[in-house]
């Protein structure tokens, strides 16, 4: 059977009716009503599944911003408390690890774990890195950039995660 490969703009216009990646990042979120509708299931290939109707900030997908003055990572970790998170810097990388043991939720028992690793720009001041967790579960890791020619000082160290009482000011796009 021949399947035509469509241009990405065409794929986006069809939205949820076009098959998406093999895996997404929505583990343990439970089923929604549209997951059970047979007309939404993919008949093109058993290896594809429909993308879920969720916003980017609800998806657990991170956003990395690096502008002239600072480097920032936004990561949705709404299922984790600051005690469940470990953030450390090793050389030119920041590693974010989250793990919580099995606990009961609305759909049964669930345990979650993730590990993310990001390369830091060479001009980030590693002595001024900070990490905070907002009330709505958005982890913000940030650090100022230093002028070129100044040594950024690379070493391994843990970055404490502080809790904020206000929701995140992360962009919704």
Curated annotation (Swiss-Prot):
<dbReference type="GO" id="GO:0001666">
    <property type="term" value="P:response to hypoxia"/>
</dbReference>
<dbReference type="GO" id="GO:0007021">
    <property type="term" value="P:tubulin complex assembly"/>
</dbReference>
<feature type="compositionally biased region" description="Basic and acidic residues">
    <location>
        <begin position="153"/>
        <end position="167"/>
    </location>
</feature>
<keyword id="KW-0862">Zinc</keyword>
<feature type="domain" description="sHSP">
    <location>
        <begin position="52"/>
        <end position="162"/>
    </location>
</feature>
<feature type="modified residue" description="N-acetylmethionine">
    <location>
        <position position="1"/>
    </location>
</feature>
<feature type="modified residue" description="N6-acetyllysine">
    <location>
        <position position="70"/>
    </location>
</feature>
<feature type="modified residue" description="Deamidated glutamine; partial">
    <location>
        <position position="6"/>
    </location>
</feature>
<keyword id="KW-0143">Chaperone</keyword>
<dbReference type="GO" id="GO:0007017">
    <property type="term" value="P:microtubule-based process"/>
</dbReference>
<feature type="binding site">
    <location>
        <position position="107"/>
    </location>
    <ligand>
        <name>Zn(2+) 2</name>
    </ligand>
</feature>
<feature type="site" description="Not glycated">
    <location>
        <position position="88"/>
    </location>
</feature>
<comment type="similarity">
    <text>Belongs to the small heat shock protein (HSP20) family.</text>
</comment>
<feature type="site" description="Not glycated">
    <location>
        <position position="70"/>
    </location>
</feature>
<dbReference type="GO" id="GO:0009408">
    <property type="term" value="P:response to heat"/>
</dbReference>
<feature type="modified residue" description="Phosphoserine">
    <location>
        <position position="45"/>
    </location>
</feature>
<feature type="region of interest" description="Disordered">
    <location>
        <begin position="144"/>
        <end position="173"/>
    </location>
</feature>
<dbReference type="Pfam" id="PF00525">
    <property type="entry name" value="Crystallin"/>
</dbReference>
<keyword id="KW-0971">Glycation</keyword>
<feature type="binding site">
    <location>
        <position position="154"/>
    </location>
    <ligand>
        <name>Zn(2+) 3</name>
    </ligand>
</feature>
<keyword id="KW-0325">Glycoprotein</keyword>
<protein>
    <recommendedName>
        <fullName>Alpha-crystallin A chain</fullName>
    </recommendedName>
</protein>
<comment type="function">
    <text>Contributes to the transparency and refractive index of the lens. Acts as a chaperone, preventing aggregation of various proteins under a wide range of stress conditions. Required for the correct formation of lens intermediate filaments as part of a complex composed of BFSP1, BFSP2 and CRYAA.</text>
</comment>
<feature type="site" description="Not glycated">
    <location>
        <position position="145"/>
    </location>
</feature>
<dbReference type="GO" id="GO:0043066">
    <property type="term" value="P:negative regulation of apoptotic process"/>
</dbReference>
<dbReference type="Pfam" id="PF00011">
    <property type="entry name" value="HSP20"/>
</dbReference>
<dbReference type="GO" id="GO:0046872">
    <property type="term" value="F:metal ion binding"/>
</dbReference>
<dbReference type="GO" id="GO:0005737">
    <property type="term" value="C:cytoplasm"/>
</dbReference>
<feature type="region of interest" description="Required for complex formation with BFSP1 and BFSP2">
    <location>
        <begin position="1"/>
        <end position="63"/>
    </location>
</feature>
<dbReference type="GO" id="GO:0070141">
    <property type="term" value="P:response to UV-A"/>
</dbReference>
<keyword id="KW-0597">Phosphoprotein</keyword>
<feature type="modified residue" description="Deamidated glutamine; partial">
    <location>
        <position position="50"/>
    </location>
</feature>
<dbReference type="GO" id="GO:0005654">
    <property type="term" value="C:nucleoplasm"/>
</dbReference>
<dbReference type="GO" id="GO:0060561">
    <property type="term" value="P:apoptotic process involved in morphogenesis"/>
</dbReference>
<keyword id="KW-0007">Acetylation</keyword>
<feature type="modified residue" description="Deamidated asparagine; partial">
    <location>
        <position position="101"/>
    </location>
</feature>
<feature type="site" description="Not glycated">
    <location>
        <position position="99"/>
    </location>
</feature>
<dbReference type="GO" id="GO:0005634">
    <property type="term" value="C:nucleus"/>
</dbReference>
<feature type="glycosylation site" description="N-linked (Glc) (glycation) lysine">
    <location>
        <position position="11"/>
    </location>
</feature>
<dbReference type="GO" id="GO:0032387">
    <property type="term" value="P:negative regulation of intracellular transport"/>
</dbReference>
<feature type="modified residue" description="Deamidated glutamine; partial">
    <location>
        <position position="90"/>
    </location>
</feature>
<dbReference type="GO" id="GO:0030307">
    <property type="term" value="P:positive regulation of cell growth"/>
</dbReference>
């Amino acid at each position: 059977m021949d399947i035509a490969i469509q241009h990405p703009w065409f794929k986006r216009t069809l939205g949820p009716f076009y098959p998406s990646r093999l895996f997404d990042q929505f583990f343990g979120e439970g089923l929604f009503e549209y997951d059970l509708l047979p007309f939404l299931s993919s008949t093109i290939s058993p290896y594809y599944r429909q993308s879920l109707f969720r916003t980017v900030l609800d998806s657990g997908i991170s956003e990395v911003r690096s502008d002239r003055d600072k480097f920032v990572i936004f990561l949705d970790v709404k299922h984790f408390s600051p005690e469940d998170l470990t953030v450390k810097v090793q050389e030119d990388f920041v590693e974010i690890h989250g793990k919580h043991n099995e606990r009961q939720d609305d759909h049964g028992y669930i345990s979650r774990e993730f590990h993310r690793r990001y390369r830091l720009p060479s001009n980030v001041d590693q002595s001024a890195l900070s990490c905070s967790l907002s009330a709505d579960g958005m982890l913000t890791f940030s650090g100022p950039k230093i002028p070129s020619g100044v040594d950024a000082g690379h070493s391994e160290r843990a970055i404490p995660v502080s809790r904020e009482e206000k929701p995140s000011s992360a962009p919704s796009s």
